[in-house]
Amino acid sequence: MSLGESLMKPTAMLYRNLVAMEVEESIRGYPIDAVVLLGGCDKTVPAQLMGAAGADVPAIALTGGPANPAIFRGRELGVGTDLWGYVNELRAGRMSQSDFDELEAASMPSVGHCPELGTASTMAALTE
């Protein structure tokens, strides 16, 4: 299950709740006594916890941890914050598509959740 929340309307929280319902129904739909939750985002981890709580089964949650910092042309990027600024630069014609493609390729250099100190890190710490 994944939330591709780019430009989501009306709100990403609606989709977090839908994922929580999907997790709960997936747990209820199989004859299991407990569940291991693997997640790593500020919406998916809470959704998994909400779903497991709703299904009322024992659960262990493991988060993926933060990704390595993203570097673009010698500058560290905030994946969630800086990327939106570059999208605006692209839309305004101040950045070429090939430069944006290069930025996009550099934006997530390893596995893990968004590396900046944000809600994904907070949710991982709270979950652990």
Question: Where in this protein do the model-derived segments appear?
Answer:
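Active-site cavity-forming subdomains of large catalytic enzyme subunits
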Residues: 13-128
